[in-house]
Amino acid sequence: MDHAEQGPDRPGVDDPGRGRRIGIDVGSVRIGVASSDPDGILATPVETVPRSKERGPDAPDIRRIADIVEEYEAVEVIVGLPQTLRGERGKAASIATVFAKRLRRKVDPIPVRMADERLTTVTAARALRESGVSARGQRPVIDQAAAVAILQGWLDERSRSVNAGDSGGDAQLPEGGQ
């Protein structure tokens, strides 16, 4: 799917069903990574991967994230698509889109989706600040916190979509799941 001109993906459409999801916040210097539990309810931080200067499917950052996808036996990867509040895209969106395309080639057939990530880094920074983490202390974990926010938003929307019967796929929540 070419995301250059279209909007972000919708959770629940062509849903792969139960399994872990990996959330990715692509920055120009670092990449935040988060994972969900197998039931797709809760997102938690995994690690921060340094961006590599190399570009291509075998670049160290792509390889590390592909290893995480395999290690966690992920059924889906969610990459944040930064947009302005008006839905416009700038350089950050282009960086994320190109990265997602490279990752998609590396982890195929695992689907790589793009999720709206307006204000996730701002929200993550505010949450860290409110929990007492200094601005200097935020740097190593801000990208992970943003990845958690991206993935948790996807999981919450997926839950609403699946419960509404809007999956377009074989999505199922666990018994008693919401």
UniProtKB/Swiss-Prot annotation:
It holds the Pfam family RuvX. GO terms for biological process: rRNA 5'-end processing. The keyword Hydrolase applies. One of its GO terms (cellular component) is cytosol. Coiled coil: none annotated. It is found in: Cytoplasm. Residues 1-18 have a biased composition (Basic and acidic residues). GO terms for molecular function: nuclease activity. It is an enzyme of class 3 (hydrolase). Residues 1-21 are annotated as: Disordered. Its EC number is 3.1.-.-. The keyword Transit peptide does not apply. CDD domains: YqgF. Belongs to the YqgF nuclease family. This is Putative pre-16S rRNA nuclease. It comes from Rhodococcus jostii (strain RHA1). The lineage of its organism: Bacteria, Bacillati, Actinomycetota, Actinomycetes, Mycobacteriales.
